[in-house]
Amino acid sequence: MTKAASGDTKSTLYCSFCGKSQHEVRKLIAGPTVFICDECVELCMDIIREEHKIAFVKSKDGVPTPREICEVLDDYVIGQGHAKKVLAVAVHNHYKRLNHASKNNDVELAKSNILLVGPTGTGKTLLAQTLARIIDVPFTMADATTLTEAGYVGEDVENIVLKLLQAADYNVERAQRGIVYIDEIDKISRKSDNPSITRDVSGEGVQQALLKIMEGTVASVPPQGGRKHPQQEFLQVDTTNILFICGGAFAGLEKIISARGAAKSIGFGAKVTDPEERRTGEILRNVEPDDLQRFGLIPEFIGRLPVVATLEDLDEAALVKILTEPKNAFVKQYQRLFEMENIGLTFTEDALHQVAKKAIARKTGARGLRSIMEGILLETMFELPTYEGVEEVVVNAEVVEGRAQPLLIYAEKKGGAASA
């Protein structure tokens, strides 16, 4: 496909897919009456690679290896190698257990539900969301803070099973092979160590209600959701083979662990370590069932979660990688927003490190990166549609610190830069 360029005797060739001219791209590949540019070829390769990675879940035996699952998680989640391995092995074994159950073997394989423990902003929820994209079984996420005991205002525990059923398009057989991720599980901890005469309907009561569906029971689920009533028809869902993954920040758990460690380290030969010098993730690695019980989880609930994986604090280097490397990295997102106005956006290396330092100081982990970026670029994005002749916006460390405005580079002044 060719178009004559106005004022030019030679014909200019254009990409048949994106419409860019041969002068706007590095290469233009010709075919019979059509052309494709190098940028479109790259985009097609990305799509093919992504589909190839996701295709592993439909292999001939239907069991992806833990390494394959980890490789896909690596594309979206930076660091947390131990937690990735725990999840990958759990999902791999979940597939194997389902295949094993269909063969009517004498040995019954029990499921190993997982508890993810880690500071806020370390990637617990993102790991679960990424798993949902790559696995070939129904997957749903639930928020523990919305759950209450049956009969009280709030969501019934059985609504989790309903969400899984909806994810399986109401195919009961598929739903019974699914995976459930319950977020903010630490928010349903018992309010105090001592039994109370008042009912704890959103804490211990929810833990009691979750016990049965996590271990395995036949749940009666109303097809349309909501509260049950006698005239209603119910769908029967067996939760025995549903894998449950629970995650929470468990703020304050590190103090319980440190206190236990301090009690053991008494005497002249004891090694004295200042708790302030140890990072939260490092302390959480030493978590034991007794610590979780002191935090407020009941022993029966802890027993239903035999696998405990802890996530590490994210250091400066990891936060810089999170800003730039994942497919949906924050820097890439803002660059795309600026591209829509035909303006480039560049963050200098020192600016990225300064953003990471700010997030560490706020103790918000990766979750705090977006709000910091938003604050830095707010004024620039407000004026962005009105900029004329601006080719690029550059953010350096001084801008992040609030001591300067982003630098504006104008098309006619490529050698110089003017302050916004």
From Swiss-Prot:
Which Pfam families does this entry report, sorted A to Z? AAA_2, ClpB_D2-small, zf-C4_ClpX
What happens when the protein's gene is inactivated? Essential, it cannot be deleted. When depleted for ClpX cells arrest before the initiation of chromosome replication and are blocked in the cell division process. In depletion experiments ClpX protein starts to decline after about 4 hours, which coincides with cell filamention and a 1000-fold loss of viability by 12 hours; SocB protein accumulates. Deletion of socB permits slower than wild-type growth of the clpX disruption.
The answer to whether UniProt assigns keyword Metal-binding to this entry is yes
Q: Where does ATP bind?
A: P119, T120, G121, T122, G123, K124, T125, L126
Q: Which residues form the signal peptide?
A: none
Q: Which GO terms describe its biological process?
A: cell division; proteolysis involved in protein catabolic process
Q: Which GO terms describe its molecular function?
A: ATP binding; ATP hydrolysis activity; ATP-dependent protein folding chaperone; protein dimerization activity; unfolded protein binding; zinc ion binding
Keyword Zinc assigned: yes
Where does the chain bind Zn(2+)? C15, C18, C37, C40
Which PANTHER family does the record associate with it? Answer: ATP-DEPENDENT CLP PROTEASE ATP-BINDING SUBUNIT CLPX-LIKE, MITOCHONDRIAL, ATP-DEPENDENT CLP PROTEASE ATP-BINDING SUBUNIT CLPX-LIKE, MITOCHONDRIAL-RELATED
Q: Which family does it belong to?
A: Belongs to the ClpX chaperone family.
Protein role: ATP-dependent specificity component of the Clp protease. It directs the protease to specific substrates. Required for degradation of response regulator CtrA, thus contributing to the G1-to-S transition. Required to degrade DNA replication inhibitor toxin SocB, this function is probably the reason why the protease is essential in this organism. Can perform chaperone functions in the absence of ClpP.
Indicate what this protein is called per its UniProt record.
ATP-dependent Clp protease ATP-binding subunit ClpX
Give the organism the record lists: Caulobacter vibrioides (strain NA1000 / CB15N) (Caulobacter crescentus)
